[in-house]
Every structure is written in C-alpha cells, then in structure tokens.
UniProtKB/Swiss-Prot annotation:
This is Urease accessory protein UreG. Facilitates the functional incorporation of the urease nickel metallocenter. This process requires GTP hydrolysis, probably effectuated by UreG. Gene3D superfamilies: P-loop containing nucleotide triphosphate hydrolases. Coiled coil: none annotated. Belongs to the SIMIBI class G3E GTPase family. UreG subfamily. Homodimer. UreD, UreF and UreG form a complex that acts as a GTP-hydrolysis-dependent molecular chaperone, activating the urease apoprotein by helping to assemble the nickel containing metallocenter of UreC. The UreE protein probably delivers the nickel. The gene is ureG. It comes from Blochmanniella floridana. Keywords: Chaperone, Cytoplasm, GTP-binding, Nickel insertion, Nucleotide-binding. GTP binds at G16, P17, V18, G19, S20, G21, K22, T23.
Length: 209
C-alpha cells in the first residue's frame, strides 16, 4: 500500500439506537474481515469504555487496535457537531498502524436522527432491530432514509414481539428509495455477507480516489 493510502484508511461510521447490535456487528465484521484487511475500531460511550472492552474480550481485534472514547455528553454531538475526540483517536490509530485499510467508528446509542459528520466518516451503516417493532422503518429519520447501508438486526425475535418482517421489508424499500439494506441475525451470521460485500465494494472505490 502506498504511503498516501496508508494515511487515508476508509472510515466507516456505525450508528443506531442503544441495544440494536452495533457492537455485535463490529465484532462479526472484524472477525470475518481481519484476514484480508488491516482494521481498527473507535468506540463511543458517554461515561465508560464498555463497548471497547466488549470487543477486546471477544478478541475481535488485538486490543491496541481498539480505542474507546468517553464522550461525556450527547452521543450525537461527538459524531456530528464536535468530532475532535474521535478524530484524535483516528489519528492515534493511523500513527500506530501505518497500513490500515478500514477504521470502524461506533457511535454511542442514539435516536433515528443521528448522523455522522462527513469529516469523520466516508460511509455510514445504521443498525436497527426487530425487537423495537415493525413500525421503525416507516418512522424515517436520517439513519433509516439516508444511511449508505441499513441493517435490520435480530430477525429471530420477530415471532416473539409480534413484528412482521414482510411489513418491515415493504416499508424499508419505500423509505430508502433503492439504497441497500439487509436483514441480519448476527448470532448466526445471517445477512452479514451482504454488509461485507458492500464494504469490499466501497473499499475498492476508496482505493481509486
């Protein structure tokens, strides 16, 4: 990899409400992609570094490739209005590993209006879960309608919460206007290949820029 590309790894923002599966998604992506790509992660929590520790304990990556940021306030602010702490963490990772391909940036749990600053993220993934109800896609918001890739997680819970996957599929197609998305069950790996293929495609685009 050229020195120029080494200084500009692809940055992937991962947002979504609390408990939707953002950390679980990053864990699976890291485990499946780390043999082909040089990866690192920045996690955001308000008062702790819980998500960082979860990923370390799960051996998603080596511990020094995962940095936890304590935002100390609204998680939306740290990924949109004032991204300085996240940019410092990214800079630290790039200085430490000069051949990084992809950095995943996990936002703190937030609502459907949360979006990443273009300064912080090249591509945005957004995670919602079936347990929140089948009405979530039609509620809209930037995470649903504008994210580069939408993940509807925990499809195995649909039968237990009375959610219709057919309704969610119809509403998602309507709200996203042909933007890519997928159903997932991160416990079994169902749907994850669609996410990985999307990232591989975008990485090829970034390499040409």
């Amino acid at each position: 990899m050229s020195n120029d590309k080494a200084k500009h790894p692809m940055k992937v923002g991962i947002g979504g409400p609390v408990g939707s599966g953002k950390t679980a998604l990053i864990e699976v992506l890291c485990k499946k992609m780390k043999t082909d790509y040089q990866l690192a992660v920045v996690t955001n929590d308000i008062y702790t570094k819980e998500d960082q520790q979860i990923l370390i304990n799960a051996h998603a990556l080596e511990s020094d490739r995962i940095i936890g940021v304590e935002t100390g306030g609204c998680p939306h602010t740290a990924i949109r209005e004032d991204v300085s702490m996240n940019l410092l963490a990214i800079e630290e990772l790039i200085d430490k590993f000069n051949n990084l391909d992809i950095i995943f940036i996990e936002s703190g749990g937030d609502n459907l209006s949360a979006t990443f600053s273009p300064e912080l993220s090249d591509w945005n993934l957004y995670v919602i879960d079936v347990a929140a109800g089948d009405k979530i896609p039609r509620k809209g918001g930037p995470g649903i309608t504008k994210s580069d890739f939408l993940i509807i997680n925990k499809i195995d819970l649909a039968q237990y919460v009375g959610a219709s996957l057919d309704v969610m599929k119809f509403d998602t197609h309507t709200m996203r206007n042909n933007r890519p998305w997928t159903f997932t069950n991160l416990k079994t790996g169902y749907g994850i290949e669609s996410v990985i293929n999307f990232l591989r495609e975008k990485k090829l685009i970034n390499n040409k820029m």
